[in-house]
Curated annotation (Swiss-Prot):
Keyword Iron: yes
Lineage of source species: Bacteria, Pseudomonadati, Pseudomonadota, Betaproteobacteria, Burkholderiales
GO CC annotation terms, alphabetical: cytosol
Keywords on record: Iron
Keyword Iron attributed: yes
InterPro entries linked: Fe_traffick_prot_YggX (IPR007457), Fe_traffick_prot_YggX_sf (IPR036766)
Full protein name: Probable Fe(2+)-trafficking protein
GO MF annotation: an example: iron ion binding
HAMAP family for the chain: Fe_traffic_YggX (MF_00686)
Pfam families in the record: Iron_traffic
GO biological process, one term: cellular response to oxidative stress
Stated family: Belongs to the Fe(2+)-trafficking protein family.
Function: Could be a mediator in iron transactions between iron acquisition and iron-requiring processes, such as synthesis and/or repair of Fe-S clusters in biosynthetic enzymes.
Source species: Verminephrobacter eiseniae (strain EF01-2)
Amino acid sequence: MARTVQCIKLGKEAEGLDFPPYPGELGQRIWANVSKQAWAGWLKHQTMLVNENRLNLADARARQYLARQMENHFFGSGADAAAGYVPPSA
């Protein structure tokens, strides 16, 4: 049986992650409070942030920026919107 969590992002009980997705205390908080579905949403948003802001992940400042955005996305006021991103019209 899959592990379930009360997902902080979705506001409902959902299937939890199999392991902490990030090292340290932040990774443990995410593992305990974030569902697989919400994590997949973050990965899509993170990809947009990297692409639209042309982040170089070899740069420690870019990685620190993404870590702050990840924490804000799940536990704060929300992550930054991807600069220049225009959602497709329906």
